[in-house]
Amino acid sequence: MKKISTFIITKNESARIARAINSVKNITDEVIVVDNESTDDTVHIAKTLGAQVIVKPWLGYVGQKSFAESMCVNDWVLNIDADEELSQELQDEIEYIFTSHNQDRYLAYQIKLLIMYRGDQKPRMFAPLNKCTRLYNKKFASFANTINSTTHDSVVFNKDVDFTGKIYLLNGIAYHYSGTSIEQLVNKANFYSSEQAKDLVKQGKKLSNFRLATEMIWCFLKAFFIRRYFVFGFDGFVDSIIFAFARFLRLAKLRDLSLKSQNVITSDNYINYCMDFKSLLQQKKRNRYPKK
């Protein structure tokens, strides 16, 4: 028995959702798609492939994934994004673990995500690779445990859970396909940076002008060299600039929100200000013309 539920959040992913669902539907009991009111064929395609689709207005990345997670009937859940695909090797590995009833040796499993550049049919040598927890028992961990963030959507263990030695890195890989176009990447950068800026305000983050001035340069170098976007050639150079601009935007928007909050005068504050100002004038008048 499989006893795995897969959940995916979507928004206008008609070009990629089929690939994601097809890579998990044979190793899971159910596929839950929580869609943020897509205007394309995402919902139709997902339903055609047998997924259970729930249309849900946007709750933020963490909120949307937490809701999708709560809709899963099984304790063991697998989360992938619409732009991801499990390799056949990874599918076989997960299936073996669960058919042999060895899944409970660990509380969670990490997956290696290999970035595939748009249009590529196979991974490039030295392509960027990330590790993240995507297969886990939701009795012990959840996206809902994320604190003070709507954008950093990561699986967090319950406070009373000792997960030392209880996370296993799977050998198989999953493919993460980069944006469908420059326009899509820019739109995502604009939306995501706005969400991040709101989070930073809630967290009380402070910003220096030096940080704002150097953020884009540092983040470009980080993406192009440390994250190895250089393996994608000039296209990687362009994507590194977009990544750096997105990181700059979140700080610029944070500064903008902070300045606006400092200049806000509520009705109560305005009344109190007027009363204080009136009292000050009366005090000055008394000091200037003391009673005889």
Swiss-Prot record:
Coiled coil: none annotated. Its EC number is 2.4.-.-. Pfam families: Glycos_transf_2 (PF00535). It is an enzyme of class 2 (transferase). The keyword Cytoplasm does not apply. It comes from the Bacteria. The keyword rRNA-binding does not apply. Keywords: Glycosyltransferase, Transferase. Gene3D superfamilies: Spore Coat Polysaccharide Biosynthesis Protein SpsA, Chain A. GO terms for molecular function: glycosyltransferase activity. Belongs to the glycosyltransferase 2 family. WaaE/KdtX subfamily. This is Uncharacterized glycosyltransferase RP128.
